[in-house]
């Protein structure tokens, strides 16, 4: 009886541990608003290649002379590599246009859709708002 109880407890613990990563990961609709598309033009401050999502930080100048610092969620490093990105694709100071969906809480955070470069080139940043997974 004692060993049977231990097996049940151990099995339950393993199932709970396996479910933790799934529960910790958010969905697009939980955090971002598909009706709040934003177009941001600014300069790259930093690109973080981290899991489960990369983060692009940009400074966006406003008409009143102030600057907003936005944090843009992108795909994981492996997704970025598949889409043609590398760690040198967005050096600090690069001028870009970002099409993204803003956070539901109104924070200066968004899930990326596309990045447009001054030469007109567009690339998908692989954010959770992307469903096609294709290069743009």
Residue ranges and their predicted role:
Residues 23-38:
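Short boundary/loop segments of OB/S1/cold-shock single-stranded nucleic-acid-binding domains
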């Amino acid at each position: 009886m004692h060993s049977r109880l231990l097996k049940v407890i151990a099995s339950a613990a393993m199932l709970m541990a396996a479910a933790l990563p799934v529960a910790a990961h958010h969905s697009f609709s939980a955090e971002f608003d598909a009706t709040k598309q934003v177009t941001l033009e600014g300069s790259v401050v930093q690109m973080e290649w981290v899991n489960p999502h990369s983060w692009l930080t940009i400074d966006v100048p406003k008409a009143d002379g102030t600057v907003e610092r936005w944090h843009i969620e992108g795909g994981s490093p492996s997704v970025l590599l598949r889409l043609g990105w590398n760690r040198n694709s967005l050096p600090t100071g690069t001028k870009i246009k970002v099409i993204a969906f803003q956070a539901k809480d109104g924070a200066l955070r968004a899930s990326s859709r596309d990045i447009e470069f001054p030469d007109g080139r567009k690339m998908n940043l692989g954010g959770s708002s992307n469903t096609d997974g294709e290069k743009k």
